[in-house]
């Protein structure tokens, strides 16, 4: 099976057989802990843009499914949308990090995310030996949207409600749901919703073990210019303090807020990590040290994580 290469690649080709065996043993308790649990993964950034990384990340997701973990994949597709808007000579701009989405732009967004990017991901999962079903919020009334109420950004929406039953049925059948962040309101009007937001709300609705945001940075950094200043573990209150202090800023703010909201609704842990780093998903989930930032609900949870030998 093609997924056999995922963990061996993550361990490094130069490792001797004994070292590889030790790494597999290190992964075992995590595999046992997460078996049968839902993990919602937001897939975007460099992990989607670069062909090699894209195939690698999806192969790692198939690996997780093969060992009994239940991944749900939510994807963006900003660069692909930009490319098609340029091809169609449709100007685009952003306000507060949100794509201004008029009727023409919304049509392209839905075409690209639902009809192109989503199906490409499903196909790549199939090629990696997995079985996936592509969906958007419209399908099976999975996600209902509503307007954000800001005329200047057009058809940019937020999640109104979620019907998790469809996803639960797919997961029980061994499928990997692949979800694009397009949904409609009660009148059928389509909305473009931030994929991080969709992932967080789905994680809460499904009672997920984890929410994972694959980004273009290693996680939350004390110094954005220093990748070695990674904060590996923090709780909701500390995360809020970092936002107020300006340590968390720019595009990282909505990602951290998304994690905070998911944790407040019962998700056990949220992770922010670099999706462009080789096998970061496996290393974050299945090793003691991890490679990104882990957020937990409370200081007590953080202390407990520390006592558990840095458990991810």
Swiss-Prot record:
<keyword id="KW-0547">Nucleotide-binding</keyword>
<dbReference type="GO" id="GO:0003991">
    <property type="term" value="F:acetylglutamate kinase activity"/>
</dbReference>
<protein>
    <recommendedName>
        <fullName>Acetylglutamate kinase</fullName>
        <ecNumber>2.7.2.8</ecNumber>
    </recommendedName>
</protein>
<dbReference type="GO" id="GO:0042450">
    <property type="term" value="P:arginine biosynthetic process via ornithine"/>
</dbReference>
<keyword id="KW-0963">Cytoplasm</keyword>
<dbReference type="InterPro" id="IPR001057">
    <property type="entry name" value="Glu/AcGlu_kinase"/>
</dbReference>
<comment type="function">
    <text>Catalyzes the ATP-dependent phosphorylation of N-acetyl-L-glutamate.</text>
</comment>
<dbReference type="GO" id="GO:0005524">
    <property type="term" value="F:ATP binding"/>
</dbReference>
<comment type="similarity">
    <text>Belongs to the acetylglutamate kinase family. ArgB subfamily.</text>
</comment>
<feature type="binding site">
    <location>
        <position position="99"/>
    </location>
    <ligand>
        <name>substrate</name>
    </ligand>
</feature>
<dbReference type="InterPro" id="IPR036393">
    <property type="entry name" value="AceGlu_kinase-like_sf"/>
</dbReference>
<dbReference type="InterPro" id="IPR001048">
    <property type="entry name" value="Asp/Glu/Uridylate_kinase"/>
</dbReference>
<comment type="pathway">
    <text>Amino-acid biosynthesis; L-arginine biosynthesis; N(2)-acetyl-L-ornithine from L-glutamate: step 2/4.</text>
</comment>
<feature type="site" description="Transition state stabilizer">
    <location>
        <position position="255"/>
    </location>
</feature>
<dbReference type="InterPro" id="IPR037528">
    <property type="entry name" value="ArgB"/>
</dbReference>
<dbReference type="InterPro" id="IPR041727">
    <property type="entry name" value="NAGK-C"/>
</dbReference>
<dbReference type="Pfam" id="PF00696">
    <property type="entry name" value="AA_kinase"/>
</dbReference>
<keyword id="KW-0055">Arginine biosynthesis</keyword>
<keyword id="KW-0028">Amino-acid biosynthesis</keyword>
<dbReference type="GO" id="GO:0005737">
    <property type="term" value="C:cytoplasm"/>
</dbReference>
<feature type="binding site">
    <location>
        <begin position="77"/>
        <end position="78"/>
    </location>
    <ligand>
        <name>substrate</name>
    </ligand>
</feature>
<feature type="site" description="Transition state stabilizer">
    <location>
        <position position="42"/>
    </location>
</feature>
<keyword id="KW-0808">Transferase</keyword>
<feature type="binding site">
    <location>
        <position position="192"/>
    </location>
    <ligand>
        <name>substrate</name>
    </ligand>
</feature>
<dbReference type="GO" id="GO:0006526">
    <property type="term" value="P:L-arginine biosynthetic process"/>
</dbReference>
<keyword id="KW-0418">Kinase</keyword>
<keyword id="KW-0067">ATP-binding</keyword>
<dbReference type="InterPro" id="IPR004662">
    <property type="entry name" value="AcgluKinase_fam"/>
</dbReference>
